[in-house]
Each structure stands twice: as structure tokens, then as C-alpha cells.
Design a protein with these regions (language model features):
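Transmembrane alpha-helical segments in multi-pass inner-membrane proteins
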Residues: 223, 233-298
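Short loop segments and helix-boundary regions at transmembrane helix junctions
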Residues: 2-6, 59-64, 85, 103-145, ...
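Single transmembrane alpha-helix segments in multi-pass membrane proteins
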Residues: 21-87, 111-118, 253, 257-267, ...
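Helix-loop-helix "hairpin" substructures at the membrane interface of multi-pass membrane proteins
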Residues: 89-94, 98, 104-109, 113, ...
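Structural signal for alpha-helical transmembrane segments and their membrane-water exit/capping regions
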Residues: 17-33, 135-139, 179-186, 308
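Transmembrane helix-bundle core of multi-pass membrane transporters
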Residues: 120-184, 211, 233-242, 320-335
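Cytosolic-side transmembrane-helix boundaries in multi-pass membrane proteins
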Residues: 1-23, 203-210, 284-335
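Hydrophobic alpha-helical transmembrane segments
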Residues: 11-16, 41, 49, 70-74, ...
Length: 335
């Protein structure tokens, strides 16, 4: 029962926990709850939100993409190098290029998983190392710093619009677009079916492998998009940019209730999971707790979330099997 209750109300519970955390920390450090700091905290979490949306779509199909941070680092380095050497290239063109390069890396992951049948975790661990290696080959271990980047390249994510930086609006737009895609498009709904019930997917003409390919393409494109956003926000590009950040991305999804077994999860949960980690990241230094505790806290929450998610999913799986058996009996009676 607890698992079912968690699955049904996880977003509300997470939102409540986030509000309580902000309130508790604000009671000790009033500046933490100032409007400016709350806006900055959301802005700090924006890239995590976008990446988590991409990871969510892969998880829905029973896959996982551990190469997202390496994809981000490689695309970010490429556009940073281009900007440093050819500052006249429009920033919008560089942003589009980063997205297309990320899409290409997603295509590579998707084809290896779909066509060759290699487990997603193996493929993306391999491509993660390959992408990092390519960065080293391109730069010989060197850096691209803010002095080499143009003012337009650095200013775009920081540009204010209706009280929020453009980076925050990118995250909001991604939430709305992915939410619409998963809820109302045929392909979006097929991602759920492909990961949640392979038998139902087969009988309804959905190619589960192809849906995994689509999810990796979308994940790669979002990672590439974030490549420019990350580099321009932090004004530096080097081999180890966002190293290990893929674990934060997976954590945001799992905490938000996206099942690692596929077919279950919502965009709102993904948002709440990312915000939960964002609050922790910003709160620990404020209250004087070592950042290393962040890893321990995140790990404990991930384990708890996985246990609750999978407990609920077992009951959901039994319901699917029961309905499938009933449908087969009805079909047998008709024939």
C-alpha cells in the first residue's frame, strides 16, 4: 500500500518536502528565501532539469544514458573553440550546432542499443569515455576560458526576460515541450508503452527498440543543447566539464519517481526531483554543512525512492498481467 500511495502522490510529497526544506533553512538564513536567491536557485538547477527530462525519456523505455554529461562537455567544447577562433559566428548558429551534434551522439547510442542489441548501460559507459577522449584530442588537455569567448556567447543565458534569466526560460520551455510531447503525441505515449509493457507494445505495432532509439536521440539533443548553456554560464570549457554530473541527472529522475524498470514517471516528478537536489546543493553551504554530505543525502534518498518505486511497480505489473490474461480469455471465447 505504501508503494502505491507513493506512486500516486509522489510529486505532491516531494513538493511539500522542498517547501519545508526551504522554510527550515530560511528560518536560519533569511536571505535564503529572498526572491532574488530563489530565482538564482532555480536558475542554478535549470540545466539539471533539462538533462533530467532527456534522461527520463530514456528511462521510460527501460534504458539509461550515462553519456549525457560527456555529450554536454564535447558539444560545449566544440562551440567554445569555434567561438574563440571565429567570434563572428552567430550565437544562435552555435546553439543549433551544439544541439545537432548532441543529436548525432544520441543517434550513435540509439543505433548501438537498437540495432546491435547491446545493453544501454554498456553502450553509454563506452561512449562516455569516447566523448571525453575526443575532447582531449581536440584540445590536448587545454582550456578555453572567458577571455577567449565573445561577449555575446557569454551573455545569452544571462539575458533577463520578464524577471528571469533566459537560462531559466529554457528550462521552463523544455518542461512544457516534453510534457506536451509525452502526454499528447503518439510517439510520446509509445515511449511509455514500449518500456512498461513489451507485450502490449508488440500487439499494438510499437517497435520497442525503435522507441529506445528515439529516446536516445532526444536525450542526446537536449544534452547538446545544454552543452552551450553550461559553457556560456560558467565561462570555461575543459576536458572534465560536468564530470560525474550524469549521476545527478539519474538521481533527479529516480527521486522524482521515474521508474528504472521503464514505463512509469511524469514530467512534474522529474521537475520535483531536480529541484530537490537543487535545494540541497544550495542549502548545505548556507547552513555550514560539508558538501560531501550532499552525496550521502542524495544516495540515501535515491535508495529510498527506488525501493518505493519498484514496490509500487510490482503491483502495477501484476495488474497489467491480470488485464492481459482477461483480454486473452475474451478473445478465446469470441473465436
Amino acid at each position: 500500500m505504501m508503494g502505491h500511495a507513493w506512486l500516486k502522490h509522489r510529486e505532491a510529497l516531494l513538493a511539500l518536502v522542498i517547501i519545508l526544506m526551504i522554510g527550515a533553512i530560511g528560518s536560519r538564513a533569511p536571505s535564503f528565501v529572498s526572491p532574488g536567491n530563489l530565482v538564482e536557485m532555480f536558475n542554478d538547477t535549470a540545466i539539471l532539469i533539462i538533462l533530467a527530462l532527456g534522461q527520463m525519456m530514456v528511462l521510460l523505455t527501460k534504458g539509461i544514458d550515462l553519456s549525457m554529461a560527456a555529450n554536454l562537455a564535447l558539444t560545449g567544447m566544440i562551440v567554445a573553440l569555434l567561438n574563440a577562433h571565429y567570434p563572428g559566428i552567430p550565437v544562435v548558429a552555435l546553439l543549433a550546432l551544439a544541439t545537432l551534434l548532441g543529436l548525432l551522439m544520441g543517434v550513435i547510442n540509439g543505433l548501438l542499443v537498437w540495432r546491435l542489441g547491446i545493453p544501454a548501460i554498456v553502450v553509454t559507459l563506452g561512449t562516455m569515455s569516447i566523448y571525453r577522449g575526443i575532447i582531449f584530442l581536440l584540445t590536448d588537455g587545454g582550456w578555453v576560458n572567458s577571455h577567449q569567448m565573445s561577449a555575446d556567447f557569454l551573455s545569452l543565458p544571462r539575458s533577463p526576460l520578464l524577471g528571469l534569466p533566459l537560462l531559466s526560460w529554457c528550462a521552463i520551455a523544455a518542461l512544457l515541450l516534453v510534457g506536451y510531447f509525452l502526454r499528447y503525441s503518439r510517439t510520446g505515449r509509445a515511449l511509455y508503452t514500449a518500456g512498461g509493457n513489451a507485450t502490449a507494445a508488440y500487439y499494438t505495432g510499437i517497435n520497442a527498440g525503435k522507441m529506445q532509439f528515439v529516446s536516445f536521440c532526444l536525450s542526446g539533443a537536449l544534452a547538446g543543447f545544454c552543452g552551450y548553456l553550461w559553457i556560456s554560464r560558467f565561462a570555461v570549457a575543459y576536458v572534465d566539464v560536468a564530470n560525474g554530473f550524469e549521476l545527478q541527472v539519474v538521481a533527479a529522475c529516480v527521486i522524482g519517481g521515474i521508474s528504472t524498470m521503464g514505463g512509469s514517471g511524469r514530467v512534474l516528478g522529474c521537475l520535483c526531483g531536480a529541484l530537490f537536489l537543487g535545494v540541497i546543493n544550495n542549502a548545505l553551504p548556507v547552513i555550514g554543512i560539508s558538501p560531501f554530505w550532499q552525496m550521502a543525502i542524495s544516495g540515501a534518498v535515491i535508495v529510498m525512492a527506488v525501493l518505493l518505486n519498484e514496490r509500487g511497480n510490482r503491483g502495477h505489473g501484476r495488474l497489467i498481467l491480470r488485464n492481459a490474461a482477461l483480454a486473452r480469455r475474451k478473445q478465446a471465447v469470441k473465436s
